[in-house]
């Protein structure tokens, strides 16, 4: 290990750390997995990463244990940022916002999404595929995991917003990857180098198996698993887009050093209908009814999330400040009183955006009218401005972090990653998964996008 540290130190400008404390810290991410690395490298720039990749390629035969795992914020819930050999943490140095406009923005992978959004809001624009961990995650991880979140109902996942990537492939060289027309693709394939070989092999794969690959595409509302081969080559448009393989590949196909995202106008005049659902028997019907109104966002969380939020309410001072927390507490008093009529099984948040505040208000009112058939199973709250609805959006976005850091004598283990559940079977699915959770005496919360329930996180005894 000492030899590995010395050799890498001689290659890179950034720091190289093999201390026990650092290796222990990087043996974890937000998942339940644990792998202790040999060395952690903090690359200064793309050149540092290229040198490490070439070092591993040159020495892999003599030392098969060598491997590279890229890491930014370390919030991956499926173990994608832990490894036993070399960790490359890009969050320390490669975290800059490079350029922007109202249509696109370019940044380095170690930049936190919260900082990226602050920068894009200067252009009155956002990149809308942020996950619930928007205040914790980095944009490199969003690309690596093909992130999706509360805005994905309207806009889709990260794969739809990646315009250009700078990627280091296994030969240790950096390349620009972007959509190509057929003439540009043919030119790439004709290159007598490693890049040309990649394009030739991938094109042969997707062209020779075109019908099978297209038929294999899952017919679900959200899918971030595996390599999305069906998105790479489109015979009808003649576009070949290798970014579609890299997005969601968790660093297994190459290491991303620069990202250009397509942006959309920042939403204005948001309003939310909050639905406190006492029973879940008609949840599938309710979801389909709501979707007819084409909301911008449709989220939900269970009663355990709600009660945990009330129980750990002081935690919110970190994100809101003491004054903000006090204001939030006052706003929650009416909702706390509603709970005396019974704790809801689910809290649903239906958000609309419109050019004017009045249009948003009318959309919220109309949805509430159209859901009157469910009035015996639900309570409704019109939060016709973003400020009014903020209290519930904070609960939704912070639900995992509450379990992760605030439940005493327990450690958080996300034992399931994202799951797709058809709305029609949710009334059957939710009680059964809760039965399993209760059987093993776990404290767990369930939250997600309605129509595709996302994750189940549990806090288990130490």
Place the predicted regions along the sequence by residue.
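N-terminal flexible segment immediately upstream of the FAD-binding catalytic core
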Residues: 1-57, 61-66, 73-103, 155, ...
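Flexible, glycine/charged-enriched surface loops at secondary-structure junctions
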Residues: 2, 15-20, 63-67, 127-130, ...
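N-terminal glycine-rich flavin-associated loop
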Residues: 8, 25, 31-64, 68, ...
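Short, conserved charged micro-motifs
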Residues: 48-51, 282-285, 356-364, 428
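Mobile "lid/hinge" segments at catalytic clefts and subdomain interfaces of large enzymes
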Residues: 148-235, 239-308, 344-346
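Short amphipathic alpha-helix segments
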Residues: 283-297, 312-327, 426-438
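Terminal amphipathic helices with adjacent charged low-complexity linkers/tails
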Residues: 295-407
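Conserved small/polar residues in nucleotide/adenosyl-binding loops
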Residues: 455-462
């Amino acid at each position: 290990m000492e030899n590995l540290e010395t050799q890498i130190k001689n290659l890179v400008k950034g720091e190289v750390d093999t201390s026990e404390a650092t290796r222990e810290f990087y043996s974890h991410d937000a998942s339940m997995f644990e792998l202790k690395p040999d060395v952690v490298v903090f690359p200064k720039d793309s050149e540092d990463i290229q040198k490490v990749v070439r070092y591993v390629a040159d020495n892999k035969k003599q030392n098969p244990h060598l491997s590279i795992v890229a890491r930014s914020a370390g919030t991956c819930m499926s173990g994608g940022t832990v490894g036993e050999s070399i960790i490359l943490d890009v969050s320390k140095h490669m975290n800059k916002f490079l350029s922007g406009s109202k249509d696109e923005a370019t940044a380095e992978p170690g930049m936190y999404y919260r900082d990226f959004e602050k920068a894009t809001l200067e252009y009155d624009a956002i990149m809308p595929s942020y996950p619930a961990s928007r205040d914790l995650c980095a944009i490199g991880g969003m690309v690596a995991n093909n992130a999706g979140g509360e805005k994905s109902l309207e806009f889709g996942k990260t794969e739809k917003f990646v315009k250009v990537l700078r990627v280091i492939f296994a030969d240790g060289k950096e390349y620009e990857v972007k959509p190509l027309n057929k003439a540009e693709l043919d030119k790439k394939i004709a290159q007598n180098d490693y890049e040309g070989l990649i394009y030739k092999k991938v094109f042969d794969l997707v062209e020779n198996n075109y019908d099978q690959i297209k038929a294999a595409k899952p017919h679900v509302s959200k899918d971030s698993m595996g390599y999305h081969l069906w998105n790479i080559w489109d015979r009808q448009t003649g576009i070949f887009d290798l970014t579609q393989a890299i997005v969601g590949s968790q660093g297994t196909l190459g290491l991303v050093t620069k990202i250009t995202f397509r942006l959309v106008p920042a939403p204005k005049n948001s309003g939310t209908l909050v639905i406190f659902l006492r029973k879940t028997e008609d949840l599938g019907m309710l979801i389909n009814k709501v979707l007819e109104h084409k909301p911008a966002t449709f989220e939900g969380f269970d009663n355990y999330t709600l009660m945990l939020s009330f129980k750990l309410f002081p935690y919110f001072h970190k994100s809101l400040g003491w004054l903000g927390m006090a204001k939030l507490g006052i706003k929650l008093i009416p909702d706390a009183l509603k709970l005396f009529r019974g704790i809801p099984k689910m809290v649903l948040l239906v958000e609309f955006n419109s050019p004017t505040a009045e249009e948003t208000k009318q959309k919220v009112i109309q949805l509430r009218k159209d859901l009157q058939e469910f009035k015996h199973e639900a309570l409704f709250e019109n939060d016709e401005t973003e400020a009014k609805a903020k209290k519930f959006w904070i609960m939704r976005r912070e639900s995992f972090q509450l379990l992760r850091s605030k439940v005493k004598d327990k450690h958080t283990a996300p034992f399931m990653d994202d799951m797709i559940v058809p709305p029609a079977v949710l009334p059957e699915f939710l009680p059964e998964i809760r039965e399993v959770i209760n059987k093993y005496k776990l404290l767990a919360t369930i939250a997600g996008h309605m129509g595709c329930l996302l994750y189940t996180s549990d806090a288990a005894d130490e």
